[in-house]
Amino acid sequence: MTTITLKLNEPIDVALRRFRRDIEKTGLIRELRARTGYEKPTTERKRKKASAVARQRLQAKRLLPPRKMY
């Protein structure tokens, strides 16, 4: 379980931002979204393949030399 302790004179929105970041790191949000309802195996494969293609696209984009600015 993720807990956040408020620091002295820390605004609530900053603490909430820290909490959300910690939740994202643990992968809790991703797991909750996956468990909200049944996903058909074909839909799951399609979603995973689309995310893999997007990852490959980003990776290839990073390998390209930067564009000229002039």
Swiss-Prot record:
The keyword Glycosyltransferase does not apply. It holds the Pfam family Ribosomal_S21. Signal peptide: none annotated. It comes from the Bacteria. One of its GO terms (biological process) is translation. The keyword Ribonucleoprotein applies. One of its GO terms (cellular component) is ribonucleoprotein complex. One of its GO terms (molecular function) is structural constituent of ribosome. Keywords: Ribonucleoprotein, Ribosomal protein. Belongs to the bacterial ribosomal protein bS21 family. HAMAP family: Ribosomal_bS21. This is Small ribosomal subunit protein bS21B. It comes from Burkholderia orbicola (strain AU 1054).
